[in-house]
Design a protein with these regions (language model features):
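Extracellular glycan-modifying ectodomains
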Residues: 1-200
Length: 200
């Protein structure tokens, strides 16, 4: 119910403001489905966090099917009146990056915070699949941050011991800037779309 109310509010807002302007959707969808995965997360936080019709503490096949249907329906509904861009999941680090770097520097054992690409794919395969289905069903576009945050083997929470995150899953200002090339296409196309919007 809270999710439904939020989506209704978003629809109302979008219907009245900047009709036709591009919409970028970026959120921690894998956490909604599988719960928190960072160090120190409470047991309740490690359970599924967002529900539609199927209530479950774990991501059962029935839960995933229900989540998938509502996710795609919502995304396609938003795409009826504007270009919609879904951002692939931002890599989640397993610990707070600045804290980890700071402790390492104090102890003379500083090293970059990373997760493996394999762990990223295992965590986010379901979200990728439903984003792909939304693209197939209603022409939604997808933005991929991995070329800017990862290499072939690892996704980085820091580079040269400089944090890219303010915690374990939110990019810092420095980290955000790495994604400017990813967003450039959106804003170039968005400027064209907005210039054609008719206002009374």
């Amino acid at each position: 119910e809270p999710c439904s109310r939020m989506i209704d509010n978003i629809h109302e807002k979008l219907a009245s403001d900047m009709l036709g302007a591009p919409l970028i959707v970026i959120n921690r969808t894998s956490m909604y489905v599988y719960g928190h995965n960072e160090e120190g997360a409470e047991p309740q936080e490690r359970k599924t966090q967002v529900f539609w019709n199927v209530l479950s503490d774990v991501a059962t096949p029935e839960y995933l099917e229900d989540f998938s249907r509502h996710y795609i329906d919502t995304a396609c509904s938003l795409a009826k009146d504007r270009p919609v861009y879904l951002v692939r999941p931002i890599p989640e680090m397993l610990a707070k990056v600045p804290t980890t770097i700071g402790k390492g520097l104090i102890m003379g054992q500083a090293h970059d915070v990373v997760i493996s690409r394999a762990d990223y794919q295992a965590r986010n395969a379901f979200v990728w699949s439903i984003q792909d289905k939304a693209r197939e069903q209603c022409g939604i576009k997808i933005l991929d941050p991995l070329p800017y945050l990862c290499d072939a083997n690892f996704c980085y929470g820091s580079k040269n011991e400089k944090p890219l995150y303010v915690d374990d899953n939110h990019l810092s200002e420095y980290g955000n800037r790495l994604l400017i090339p990813m967003f450039s296409e959106v804003f170039t196309q968005g400027a064209v779309a907005v210039s054609g919007v008719q206002k009374d």
